[in-house]
Amino acid sequence: LMLEPDTKQTLKKYYEEGNFDEAREVISEICMELEASIDEEFFLSGATERPSDAFNKYLHPEDYLEKTSKCVIMTHARFLSLPTKLLKKFEIIIDEDILYNSMLTRVGSVKISTLENVLKESRLSYEARLEIENLLDLQEGKCYKKETYGRIELDIETIEKCKANDNLTEFLKAGCYMRQKDCIKYLPPIKFPKCKLIILSATLDNVIYELFFPTREFILHEVKQAAYMGNVIQYPAYSMSRNTIKNIIKSNDLSYSTPAMLFKKILSYTYNVTYGITFKKYEKDLPLKNTLHFGNLAGTDCYSGKNGVIIGTPHFPTYLYELIACTIDISESSTNSYKNRRVNYKGDRFRMMSYKNEILQRIQFYLISSELEQAVGRSRLLRTNNTVFVFSNFPCEQADFCEFDYLKNADVPKQDTDQRL
């Protein structure tokens, strides 16, 4: 649907603020304009339903789902927004790991200045004021878990007066919080609808699921891993984390004084590469026409059957690991625990920045592995005979390892925190 730039920007603003009612009103107005413009040629062109009917399915899916017996395809986010009572009438099949893709990584942020502006509003309820004051009083770097969810709401007028783009509605309904210097990070409650779910995923970790949903019954049907038709060639001499890349560039070896020079050297160990994946910060430095970055990979199918290169170990921010752990009552601060240590992952031993707590380690491995396998999956190796080159010390599935120092001419600092053993 083609939208006017102003309309598109307005919708984007409402969604970012969590103001979904206002967004629905804008979409309804667009629908009315379309409805007024249709004529006989509209249906002669092959259209099977009026714009108003199609829009109503999107805006009010509950009404449609109550009546239909058809197969319905929707996003993870839309599925998680629907009531359990409605979902129970369907056989639900979820494609991909919904816990990783749509729940654990949905961390949000609200600026301290925004919350201070909210406190200036005279219309603010006593409960909301007390909640915000308590959150502002949090010790920096320490997680806080709220025992009851969704009790407090702000009216639209208060949100508009604050002139903030932060999602205050979602913020006050969150489950766990961590104060940082100029903002408060938060993680929405991690909840599944109470009905039967069938989840199909190659990265699903049943232990992680049981940690977050201890009262649910899980039946795991493991399917033997299919051998890749293509190949994964992995170079584990360096983690190529953001910190490692930065340290290599800062070293005294002028051969790699810029990310572009470093990536050019790395690419010399590959062949016929069509696309590259690395961190968003360094994406423009990849000397390739086609690039992607970690965190923005799902659904990309245009590189099926193409050779690709992946540079980096996609570590997540420590506040995300700790917020996730807080939801299952595990408290461990990165200040004292997040260190360079020897770890064991699926029988492979190597060094990386990680936690002492084994459950926190497992959460960290789950997130990193899921993102790396998502990256490898862009070439569709199960059904195409091509090659993905991975430059990371975090082991990928079915990888053939090339154990040598491919930057041996570089004066890499000994403090490389994630170097493989």
Predicted regions and their residues:
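ASCE RecA-like P-loop NTPase motor cores
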Residues: 1-421
